[in-house]
Design a protein with these regions (language model features):
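Core catalytic alpha/beta fold that binds nucleotide/phospho-ligands
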Residues: 1-253
């Protein structure tokens, strides 16, 4: 299937406990090196999710171009961000990024000819045990702290995970990861507007156009969504030219 022009395709997959037979089928999508790598993971659930996530990435890429799941090859940036190898990117012009948390895997795909395009996604499960005050002081910009300061405890925790998902999506897009100071940029939660794109029932709300500060970051575009129960997801991307990106959702089984 040819990817739509100017569309960001978002694939949402439930990460349920896989049956042994299904997991074996998924492992057939992997390269020998990947199977060897994942076999070294001692925690069974972590191992299963690693296999499932990589297999679903490969299978989903194969819906966009005439390559078998096992044929995709990846390169990695200095901080480990995966991308298609140069030859396959030239063939397909596909960009991707993925994130998983709890019971869900989120995968973003888009087609664009520029290798300079930057794409990042994050999905986060709200966690009541996280000491958000400590994290805020170390990793949030003054503008973000100001947004959170006057909120009641429950609302502050919700807003904290909104900001964390947005910040993660940004550093995943840049490929710098935690090597990039998290307090060196900020998102404005009061900005943005409702996103009218059709979406799965699991996504209860979606906003687009959340502002990224400082002002020189205006070419970036960000989205923030909420899921039940207690999940939020964020998408951030930059392209060399202004594009009115449209979201297209796909719910996996």
């Amino acid at each position: 299937m040819e990817p739509p022009i100017n569309a960001v395709q978002l694939f949402l997959y439930p990460l349920r406990q896989s049956e042994p037979l299904k997991l074996k089928d998924l492992a057939l999508c992997l390269t020998p090196a990947e199977r060897e790598k994942f076999a070294r993971i001692s925690h069974k659930e972590v191992q299963q999710r690693a296999i499932t996530s990589r297999a679903l990435l490969r299978k989903t890429l194969s819906t966009q171009a005439p390559l078998a799941a096992r044929e995709w090859c990846f390169d990695y940036g200095p901080q480990g961000k995966p991308r298609l190898c140069d030859e396959q990117f030239q063939q397909t012009q596909l960009h991707f990024n993925l994130s998983h948390s709890g019971d869900w895997l989120l995968l973003a795909l888009l087609k664009h000819p520029s290798p300079e395009l930057q794409l990042g996604v994050d999905i986060e499960r709200l966690r009541m045990r996280t000491s958000i005050d400590t994290v805020m002081r170390h990793y949030f910009a003054p503008f973000e702290l100001q947004q959170l300061r006057n909120l009641d405890d429950a609302t502050r925790r919700e807003a904290f995970f909104d900001l964390w998902a947005l910040k993660e999506s940004y550093i995943k897009a840049t490929g710098k990861g935690l090597a990039q100071p998290l307090d060196g940029f900020a998102f404005d939660l009061s900005s943005g507007e409702a996103c009218s794109a059709e979406r799965p029932a699991e996504i209860v709300s979606m906003r687009r156009g959340l502002l990224l500060k400082p002002k020189e970051n205006t070419q970036w575009q960000s989205w923030l969504g909420h899921m039940e129960p207690g999940y939020r997801l964020a998408l951030t991307l930059w392209a060399p030219a202004a594009i009115n990106w449209q979201l297209q959702w796909h719910l996996g089984q």
